[in-house]
Amino acid sequence: MGTLIKQECFKLFKKKSTFIAPIVFILLMVAQGYIATKYNKIFTPQESFTSAYNGFSWFAFLLIIQASTIISMEFHYGTIKNLLYREYSRTTMIVSKIITLFIISLIYFVITIIASIVIGSLFFNDLNIFESSGNQLSLLNQLLLVSLGTFVGVWLVLSLTLLLSSATNSTVFYLASSILAVIQTALLEKIDWLKWNPINMMNIMLQTVEKGFSKSTKLELHELFIGNIAYISIFLILVVFIFKKKNI
C-alpha cells in the first residue's frame, strides 16, 4: 500500500499543473485581497478573509480535475494492467488512489489557509483575526470552519467524481444532476425527507459562510456534516466495489 501511495504521489508531482496551478491560485487570491482594499464596501476585509479570498474554490476546481483523471488515465494509457501484473489487488490500488487524493487535498487546503493569513496581514494589518465578541467566532475560527465545511463538501463532489470515473458516462451524470438540482429545489418545500439528498448536502459550503442558508437547505450545519460524511463513505465504498468488478 505504501509503495502504491508513493507512486501515485510521484505521478501527481510529476505533472506541471500540480505546482503551477497552486501558484496561479495564490496570485489570484492576492489579486482579490488587493481589490478588497480598493472596493472595501463591496468586498469587506472580514468577508474576504473568511472566504479565503476564494482560494478554496480554485483549489476545489483543481481537485475535481485530478479526481476525474486519477482512474481514467490508468485505463487510457494501459498502466492499470502493469499494476495488476505486479500482483497488487484491485482494492489496494483504488484505496491508494483515494488516500493520495486525500493527502493532496489536505495539502491544498492547508496552503490556502496559510496564504489567507499572510494575505490578510499584508493588506489588512489592522484586522484582528483572533478577536471574538459574544457568540461571534473570531475571524480565524470562521476561516477554519469555512475550510472544514468546504473540505467536506468538496470531498462529497470528489467521491461522486471517482464513482463516475469508475462506472458511468460523465455527460449523463452531470445532466442528471442538473435536472435533480432543479427538481429538489422545487420539491424541498413539499417533501421533507428530500432535504437529505446528496445535492442538498453540497450546500454545506454555502451554509458555513451564511448561517441563514439553513432556511433553504432545511438542515442545521451539524446535520449537513453528518449527511456529507455518510454519503462520502457510501460513494467511496461503491467506488471500491465497482473498481473490483470493472473489466480491464
Summary of predicted features, one role per range:
Residues 2, 23, 212-248:
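Alpha-helical transmembrane segments of multi-pass membrane transporters/translocases
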Residues 1-22:
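Aromatic- and glycine-rich beta-strand/loop motifs that create alpha-glucan
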Residues 31-39, 165-203:
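Transmembrane helix segments
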Residues 22-27, 99-117, 175-192:
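Hydrophobic alpha-helical membrane-insertion segments
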Residues 63-67, 76, 80, 115, ...:
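Hydrophobic/aromatic residues in alpha-helical transmembrane segments
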